[in-house]
Curated annotation (Swiss-Prot):
Enzyme superclass (EC): ligase
Keywords in alphabetical order: Aminoacyl-tRNA synthetase, ATP-binding, Cytoplasm, Ligase, Nucleotide-binding, Protein biosynthesis
GO biological process: histidyl-tRNA aminoacylation
Taxonomic classification: Bacteria, Pseudomonadati, Chlorobiota, Chlorobiia, Chlorobiales
Top-level lineage group: Bacteria
GO cellular component labels: cytoplasm
Gene name of this polypeptide: hisS
Name of the protein: Histidine--tRNA ligase
Amino acid sequence: MSSFQCVKGTRDILPDESLLWSFVSSHFHHVASLYGFREIRTPMFEYTDLFQRGIGATTDIVGKEMFSFQPDPAGRSITLRPEMTAGVMRAALQNNLLAQAPLHKLFYIGELFRKERPQAGRQRQFNQCGAELLGVSSPAAVAEVMSLMMHFFGALGLTGLTLKVNTLGNAEERLAYREALQAYFAPHRAMLDASSQERLEKNPLRILDSKNPALQELIAAAPRLYDYLQEASLRDFEKVLFYLTERRISYTIDYRLVRGLDYYCHTAFEVTSNELGAQDAIGGGGRYDALARELGSATDIPAVGFAVGMERLLIVLEKQGLLGNRHARPPRLYVVVQQQEMLDHALQLVWRLRNGGIRSELDLAGRSMKAQMREANKLGALYALFVGASECASGKYGLKNLATSEQTDLSIEAVMQLLHDHVTE
């Protein structure tokens, strides 16, 4: 055993588990493409001030959870990305995407990094898949993005999910609500934990996101942002709910839902699973019209998006028995080398078979024929092809059906034709 271990908060994804990740990723690729979204890939690290301005200086992510470093003493600080949206918007602005077309539908699958206390479904290096719709934030656009997320979960077969929605209004409405929250929580300062006391001064909306059991009754009685909304914001939210109802997407209005990032406005949403504990969210998102201006745009750019935590998603899929027994596709053919001096010839055959689109395997360790046959059966090969001196001389090879034990002598061309005609993927 090596004296080296993976860093705390990280983990290895070995080949069998990697198949599960590919299963989930391929579903997301498929569903996102159905909705017209195209993949974007951004760097794993960005300048630190991108996240400070984009996510918000008062958030826990910026204040406590970022991995930042300064590679050049005279240069700017760099941070491993803790979330994807700011980087996607930066890429859109830098590359003038919205000047090329007024609407962009983008999706991503990527790794992120946060200094969190490692626990089930929450690591310091983790993965998200998500989508961003840039250029439009009408109620129809918001419903489109939410539909994509719920369609993805449905395609995986998930049950027991709750879609929670809320409206955070516009900046003016949130300012009035912030003042109301400060007035409400201030007399109860002594009841607040240290984190909530800090949030009371910087951003009291974050108190609503507290999971501290001792504060839940106090939070439940707090003023509702909904009561500070003006008619335009109310109409916008009601139209989003109308579209969800039209699409037969069930939802619950949660007036305490604020999400953990400062750039959200108007509609915010979150999906939770009854398979998880207190940390029950597996995905969420919302509108973020002002993010572009925070990153240097001359104007706001309407936008809406979501992200799904893939580690938590896999936990739920496993608990609901939706991952099944997924294995790598077996080779169609296992080439059995009868004498080691025939290895070069066998390698040429395998090269030809693979170029012909036939998954083929052979032994590179010089094992006995008996050991090679055991390996062929272990891998689930459909056929074994025997390569020895007499076969090489005649140009015909023994092809054995490992299910029926029937064996026939065929040329390599006939072997390839048989496999193409009678063996499906």
